[in-house]
Amino acid sequence: VRFLSGYFGKRTADKAKKNFLWGGVSLIVLGILLLIPTGFEGALQFQDAVKCKVEVLDCDNSSLIDTGIIRTGQQICKIKFLSGKFKGQENQGWNMLSGSLSQDKIFRPGDKVQAVVHHDGEKIISVNLIDYFRLEGELILAMAFALFLVIFARGIGLRSVFSFFLTILVLWKILVPLFLKGYNPILFGLIAVATMTFLILALVYGFDRRLLVSFCGSMSGILFAMLLSIICSKAFHIHGAVMHNSEALLYSGFQDLNLTWIFMASVCVGASGSVMDLSVDITSAVHEVVANAPEISRSRAIKSGMNVARAAMGTMTTTLLLAYSGTCLAMLMTFMAQGTPVYNILNNNVVASEIINTIAGSFGLAMTAPLTALIAGSLFTKKADFTKA
């Protein structure tokens, strides 16, 4: 008993040491990603201007022109600088309205606003009021989310927070710049997704068999989703310009970008989260079954995994459908309001692209579930010792 106690105590200590080491490595990776330049810092607009936060003190709406629900013209506001070089000073700010409901805003006294200040030394030339200042609220929301994860899931929650910010940094610092520089979106999209998947799963599981099982299961589904997106995009004649704001890239000096390939890569990236989620669910379920019943046969372990997979797939495919439908709700309302036949709706290129997103992701889930169950049942029943995890 003393020998076994010492043995498992050593195993626990080794596991804690590995988790601590992996946590340190994660922090280093996050730090490196934060410091990596994207290569597009020189393209920043208003480099000769100061960006700051201001408070609206008073508004003059006499120059606004109302045309139905649309407003154009300019709003002149008295403002007070809350940050930046001119903090504490008061000045006049201009809010230009172009008649776009999605872009225009009407400020009121007391609003906190993001402003761009053009100046010549200590002399202010002009102040453009850009948008409501939302950074503080977004930061509070992110911190509340991170705190909830840590309180609820403790160590795993902390690692989940790391994985969340790691994903953001990989997308913003690596994937997006590579796409803008013209690298193959399909190849580098897969590499980026594989890297993120491995790092996220390693943060959740550490380095053990569960990592191998969930990674292999996830990548099988992601690869299948990517393959299906390539085939369907070509078969349905979908151009990448269906992506929101993508066409503007072509008019901004990036006319050599292959938007269709970027669309194919976006399907892979979009499906990776749900695929990874399903793979983790099945991996953890099979591991718990075998850990609590070490004598279970391989076939029964695989069957248990398949049962979990079937139940999870039923909701995960619906999750994808709801997620993509939610982004298209206004478009669907427009089609219905105009009396557009369902035949024409389904044949629309934007709707077809969302169908590819949904079906390719669902096929990825369908591929992930049985393969993960098969791999988990095979690997976890090879040894009787399941205390390592």
Where are these regions (language model features)?
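Hydrophobic secretory-pathway targeting helix
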Residues: V1-V50
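Pore-lining and gate-forming transmembrane alpha-helices of multi-pass membrane transport proteins
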Residues: G217-I222, S252-V269, T315, T319, ...
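Juxtamembrane helix-loop transition segments at the membrane interface in multi-pass membrane proteins
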Residues: F207-C216, F236-E247, D281-A293, V342, ...
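Hydrophobic alpha-helical transmembrane segments of membrane transport and translocation systems
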Residues: A311-G314, A323-S325, L329-A389
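Extended, hydrophilic extramembrane loops/domains of integral membrane proteins
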Residues: G99-G137
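Helical hairpin unit composed of two closely spaced alpha helices linked by a short loop
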Residues: S272-I282, V286-L332, G339
